[in-house]
Each structure stands twice: as structure tokens, then as C-alpha cells.
């Protein structure tokens, strides 16, 4: 289901026209002709379209030519970390390697603001961890990272604040620690005392089937197990 994450990012980047509202970056309204702000942004779209007939090296050379400052050293650092072959043609790159190239293009000019749309899709688990380390490095420099993902584990690893979008509307913005306190895990218990357990825990039953009940739990697991220890339970699934 399309929630509006990519549309929001494309709107921020002035790739599509906004129907209402405005985008402020560094307390300044950002429009498509503002070169000064654009140079501070590293953008990674969810789908990457580049010049297929170029090699990786030629694409990076072309991108580097737009910047007056020396970014060659940073470019080489990123190539080494992400293990990308510069000799390959873009049309021959796998989805994972194309994503690596997109990451390098977004990061190599040392931007102060990173706007990343589903950046880990296509990366294997090892490269995902390399990417997370890159983000932590950028964060330690005081740079801003605007990150779109539907993977909740990434949110907890990376983010300080979380904005939740539903049906194209931003419905909530919270600090990650506050959101974590409210997060639920679903528990299924099979017991002849299941109704009594639900009443004792003060939970709402999501579904039930005979002696089995499913409910949302926000207690730490050790505390939940301690509360359940006084009951005879045939089966528990967390």
C-alpha cells in the first residue's frame, strides 16, 4: 500500500509540484532553483536511473565535475567501503551494486543533509551493516539524515525522531525512545485460564480460538513471564 513516503521526499526535492504547504531547509524556503541549498543535500531515490552506457568510474567522474571542492578522497573511501567495481558498466550492475553507486553519489560531496528513500533495499545484510556504519559516521559529524523506510528495525537503529505517514498525511512525530515505550509485541497464550490471564494483565484480546488468546503486550518479556508464572499455560508464543 502506498502511504506517501516517496511522494513526500520527491516533493521536498522539488521533483513534483506541491499541492499545498512549503519546504523549509535551514529556516529557508527551498525552491528548485536554489543551488546553494542543493549543494548541501545528498539525495538517494528509491529507484535509481542513470546513464546505462557509462561505466561506474565515468558516472562518478561526471558527478564529481559539478563540485568545486575536492571530493575525490571521500569518493575513493566510499568505493572501498562498499566494494564497488569502477570498471563495470552501469547497465551490467546488479540491483545491489546499483544501490551502492547511488549511495556513493549521495554521500561523496560531503553533504550536510542526507535525504534517503528506502536506501537499504537491494543491499545484502553485510552491506546493510556497512551502510548503517556510514550513517552513524555522518550523524557523529552533526549532519542531518532524513530517512524513509518501512523496516521498523532500521528505525530503532538509526533514528532520533520518527514521523509516521498514513494515507499521505503526517499523523505523528515522536522521539524514538518514546515510540519504543509504546510499541507492542503480540502474544498468543493457550491456557484453560486464558480469560483470567487477560483480565489480570488488563489487555485487550485481539483474537481467540478456544483456550487460545492473542493480545498486544507492552511489558518487558521478563516481567510478562513473571506475571504468567502463577498460571498453568499449555503454550505461549511471543
Where do the PLM segments sit?
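Helix-to-loop junction immediately C-terminal to a conserved catalytic motif
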Residues: 13
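Conserved ABC nucleotide-binding domain
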Residues: 72-94
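Conserved ABC transporter NBD signature motif
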Residues: 21-32, 36-37
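Catalytic Walker B motif of ABC-type/P-loop ATPase nucleotide-binding domains
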Residues: 114-118, 123
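ABC transporter nucleotide-binding domain
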Residues: 131-216
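Helix N-cap at the start of a conserved alpha-helix in ABC-type nucleotide-binding domains
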Residues: 125-127
Amino acid at each position: 500500500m502506498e502511504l506517501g513516503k516517496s511522494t513526500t521526499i520527491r516533493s521536498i526535492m522539488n521533483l513534483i509540484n506541491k499541492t499545498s504547504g512549503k519546504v523549509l531547509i535551514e529556516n529557508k524556503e527551498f525552491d528548485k532553483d536554489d543551488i546553494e541549498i542543493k549543494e548541501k543535500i545528498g539525495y538517494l531515490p528509491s529507484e535509481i536511473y542513470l546513464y546505462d552506457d557509462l561505466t561506474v568510474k565515468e558516472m562518478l567522474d561526471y558527478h564529481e565535475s559539478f563540485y568545486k571542492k575536492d571530493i575525490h578522497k571521500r569518493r575513493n573511501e566510499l568505493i572501498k567501503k562498499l566494494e564497488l567495481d569502477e570498471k563495470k558498466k552501469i547497465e551490467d550492475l546488479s540491483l545491489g551494486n546499483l544501490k551502492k553507486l547511488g549511495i556513493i553519489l549521495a554521500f561523496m560531496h560531503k553533504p550536510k543533509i542526507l535525504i534517503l528513500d528506502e536506501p537499504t533495499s537491494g543491499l545484502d545484510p553485510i552491506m546493510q551493516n556497512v551502510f548503517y556504519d556510514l550513517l552513524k559516521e555522518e550523524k557523529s559529524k552533526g549532519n542531518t539524515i532524513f530517512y524513509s523506510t518501512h523496516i521498523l528495525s532500521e528505525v530503532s537503529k538509526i533514528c532520533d525522531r520518527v514521523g509516521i505517514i498514513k494515507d499521505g498525511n503526517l499523523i505523528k512525530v515522536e522521539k524514538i525512545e518514546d515510540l519504543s515505550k509504546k510499541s507492542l509485541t503480540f502474544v498468543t497464550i493457550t491456557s484453560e485460564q486464558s480469560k483470567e490471564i487477560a483480565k489480570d494483565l488488563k489487555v485487550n484480546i485481539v483474537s481467540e480460538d478456544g483456550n487460545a488468546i492473542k493480545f498486544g503486550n507492552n511489558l518487558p518479556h521478563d516481567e510478562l513471564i513473571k506475571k504468567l508464572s502463577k498460571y498453568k499455560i499449555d503454550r505461549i508464543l511471543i
